[in-house]
Amino acid sequence: MRKETPPPLVPPAAREWNLPPNAPACMERQLEAARYRSDGALLLGASSLSGRCWAGSLWLFKDPCAAPNEGFCSAGVQTEAGVADLTWVGERGILVASDSGAVELWELDENETLIVSKFCKYEHDDIVSTVSVLSSGTQAVSGSKDICIKVWDLAQQVVLSSYRAHAAQVTCVAASPHKDSVFLSCSEDNRILLWDTRCPKPASQIGCSAPGYLPTSLAWHPQQSEVFVFGDENGTVSLVDTKSTSCVLSSAVHSQCVTGLVFSPHSVPFLASLSEDCSLAVLDSSLSELFRSQAHRDFVRDATWSPLNHSLLTTVGWDHQVVHHVVPTEPLPAPGPASVTE
C-alpha cells in the first residue's frame, strides 16, 4: 500500500478572473458530483445543505486545476435545488438528479459558456438520489427516495417505464456499459436487483449483500460484462459475478459507509472507493489496497478518472475540496534490500 504522493507542481498558465454569463457568483459548499469529459474538462455539481434553502449549481472547468474557483470556470448555472448526482450525456448534455424530485437535462451551448435547460421533469415524489445513462446514450435510469425507478427516453423527454420493485428508498442505479437494456439498482431494503428491460419481469435479485448491512454503491466492471462491485454501509467492498450471483471477493476497505465506487480506464482497471470515513482508497483486481488518501476533511462524495492521464484521479467532498491524486500505476517494489532508496 502506498500513501498519497502530491502531484508535481507545474506553474499554471496565467489565468484571468472572468465569470461567464449566467454563472452564479458563489459555489455552494458541499461538492456532490464530479465527471471528466473525454477532452479532460471537469464538470462539478454542488449543493448547499444548510440554511432555509437547499440550493445547487453546475460548473464546467476547462482547466480542472482551477476548480473549485468560480472565477475560472468556463460555464456555470444555478439549479432549483441541490444536485444529488449527475452524468454526461454525450459531449454537451448533462443529466442531473435533483433534491427537488426532478430529473433535469441541461446542455452546453456551442461556445460552452452557457448551460441551458432542456427539460425538468417532476416524475418522482421525493429526492432523486441517482441517475445513470444506458449504453445506447438515448435512455437513462433514475432512482429516488420515493422507492421508484424510472427509465427515461431523453430525446422524447418522457418516462418509458416506472418500477416499484424495491421496498425502501433507492440509493444507487448503474447502467451496464456492455448491454443497453441492463442496469443494477440497490436500496435500503438490503437488496441488489439486476434489471433487463427486455424481459416481461425485468428485475431479478442478486443475493449477495451481507445481512444487516445495506448496499450503498454500485459499479460495473468496464471489461467483464457479468461482473460488478458494490459497497455497503459498513465500509465493505465486494466483487460479484452475476452468473453465479455470489460474491467472488470481499474486503473491509473503510470504517464507515461507502459513498462511491469508480473503475479506472486502465487495461487492468483499478477501483476507486470513497467513504464517509473521509478517505479514498484505490484497489487492484484482487481488492487489495494500492493507495489511500485522507486529504478530505469531510465525506468524500465522488471521484472521476482523467481520460488524458490515467494516473490522475480527482475527488470531491463536502469539505469543498477538489483533490487531484496521482495514483501509482506500476507494481509496488518487493520488500527487501533492493527496494531501499536513499
Curated annotation (Swiss-Prot):
One Gene Ontology term from the biological process aspect of the record: ubiquitin-dependent protein catabolic process
Gene: WDR77
Keyword terms of this UniProt record: Cytoplasm, Nucleus, Phosphoprotein, Repeat, WD repeat
Cellular component, GO annotation: Cul4B-RING E3 ubiquitin ligase complex; cytoplasm; cytosol; Golgi apparatus; methylosome; nucleoplasm; nucleus
The protein's name: Methylosome protein WDR77
The organism of origin for this protein: Homo sapiens (Human)
Family annotation (InterPro entries): Methylosome_Comp_WDR77, WD40/YVTN_repeat-like_dom_sf, WD40_repeat_CS, WD40_repeat_dom_sf, WD40_rpt
WD repeat coordinates: 22-75, 78-116, 123-162, 165-205, 209-250, 253-293, 295-330
Biological role stated in the UniProt entry: Non-catalytic component of the methylosome complex, composed of PRMT5, WDR77 and CLNS1A, which modifies specific arginines to dimethylarginines in several spliceosomal Sm proteins and histones. This modification targets Sm proteins to the survival of motor neurons (SMN) complex for assembly into small nuclear ribonucleoprotein core particles. Might play a role in transcription regulation.
SUPFAM superfamilies cross-referenced by the UniProt entry: WD40 repeat-like (SSF50978)
Tissues/organs with expression: Highly expressed in heart, skeletal muscle, spleen, testis, uterus, prostate and thymus. In testis, expressed in germ cells and Leydig cells, but not in peritubular myocytes, nor in Sertoli cells. Expressed in prostate cancers, in seminomas and in Leydig cell tumors.
Subunit details: Component of the methylosome complex composed of PRMT5, WDR77 and CLNS1A. Found in a complex composed of PRMT5, WDR77 and RIOK1. RIOK1 and CLNS1A bound directly to PRMT5 at the same binding site, in a mutually exclusive manner, which allows the recruitment of distinct methylation substrates, such as nucleolin/NCL and Sm proteins, respectively. Found in a complex with the component of the methylosome, PRMT5, CLNS1A, WDR77, PRMT1 and ERH. Directly interacts with PRMT5, as well as with several Sm proteins, including SNRPB and SNRPD2 and, more weakly, SNRPD3 and SNRPE.
Location of this chain's protein in the cell: Nucleus; Cytoplasm
Domain of life: Eukaryota
Cystine pairs: none
GO MF terms, alphabetically ordered: methyl-CpG binding; transcription coactivator activity; ubiquitin-like ligase-substrate adaptor activity
Phosphothreonine: residues carrying this PTM: 5
